[in-house]
Amino acid sequence: MDQSKMEFNQNKRTISWVHLMPFALALSVAACGNGSGPATGGGSSGGGGKTGTGPTTGRLLDTAVSGVGYAASSGAAANTDENGIFKYSHGDTVEFKLGGLALGKVKGAGIITPMELAGESANKLQNLLILLQSLDIDGNPDNGISIPPSAAAAVATSINLDSDPAAFAASAELQKAREAGGVSGAVKTANQAKAHFLSQGIPMLSSSIWVKHDDTSASVIRISTSGGGEYLNGEATPDDSCDANRVCGGKLVSKAGVEYGVAGVSEFDTRGFKFVSKPVIDTNLQAGLSNPRATVRVRTDGSDLINSDIVTVQREKKQASLFGELFHIAGTLEISSDKEPIKTEIKESRYSAMENEPKGIIGAWAADQTNIKTQTYFFFSNGKFMMVDPVGNPEHAENCGPGVEFASYTYDAGSKALSIKGFTYDTNGCAGFSETGASSFNLNVDGNTATLEKQDKSKISLYRVSK
């Protein structure tokens, strides 16, 4: 059996809706429990997007892949278009094919990539990348992948997507399909295909602003859409003295605060991309994006940002009897054998796309339209407000540094009156609204710009950055 498939099959995939834990700790807390965040399901909007109904569309991406056949369980069937778009209905399964070769059958989602189509097979993931990129008519996947109908029709059902990638790239079946489609140039090597897919990691992850929040805490991630990896992260979550393995001590490990820096992806597997970051500003210690575990992977299905980790399954402890506790009667101490296999499972937690009301206050707003390193304001539909501030007030840096605010708000769309009060978190001192509150929020007609006036009559021009 293929070693990569053996390793993946040893893992049990479970989804854990761990709300509002700092990004770097959420997965380990999901595995071990006893975290400092709110209880699961405790808010009006947490990780995980809302379930939709009816017809919708998704995109097949390495870069956009056109010319791949698809069939949705509700009946929609065609080829992906030049933007990689396919049609399906919420709740569908969708099967993708090239000619008679089944590429994979998956649950319909806003974004489907070879990671989803590959299931748990590392070889299949690599070979799908080689196949799609090598059938691109102009040989340049950077401008999209366009597979000619004649090439797709010539893809043989005998092609083994689980074979060794080097052998797959050299296979006669792949070359025949390329010749049938008039595709010139060389077949993409495994390294070339991998490098290109890695280059798409940050653009995929920046498709939305990602949030987890409830009535007591919030965590937000914004990655620049320019592709350069610039990011802003805010954590309004409780102080925690436990590390990612839930080993606790007297030293504070994570706290509410802000991160700003540059991020990238260094590798990938069937669970997602390995996220790496270089923070320039980091006031939240090990919370946020600056200290991910080595086994954490991140991907997006278009609606959610999905974080997963491989964790050790904790052995269940037998409950001692009351009699045994009282009289200190214990059985033989059970020692696990060195030969006993270590059981692991995959734990997942999710951020949802920031909600957005096109003609209302709900959404994300930034003080600078083009920069990520700017004060950013989040108005949630549950009446909660968060400010993520990577700059503070430079004129009073000692008391007004970078940080976050989390509070309640009320807004009257008729009078434009805005009130922000009841601050649960305030780590940027005098730089935000905790000392000089808001008085009005005046939306412009287009809904994309607004003027926020503070109680001291100073005004802030804001730009909608959620969508």
Which functions belong to the PLM regions below?
Residues 1-15:
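N-terminal secretory signal peptides that target proteins for export/translocation
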Residues 2, 25-54, 467:
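Bacterial Sec-dependent N-terminal signal peptides
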Residues 16-26:
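Sec-dependent signal peptide recognition
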Residues 43-69, 202-206, 354-361:
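N-terminal low-complexity, Pro/Thr/Ser-rich intrinsically disordered segments
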Residues 199-211, 222, 348-366, 378:
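N-terminal helix-cap/turn-to-beta initiation motif at the start of protein domains
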Residues 236-328, 337-340, 370-371, 389-457:
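Contiguous, well-ordered beta-strand patches that form the walls/edges
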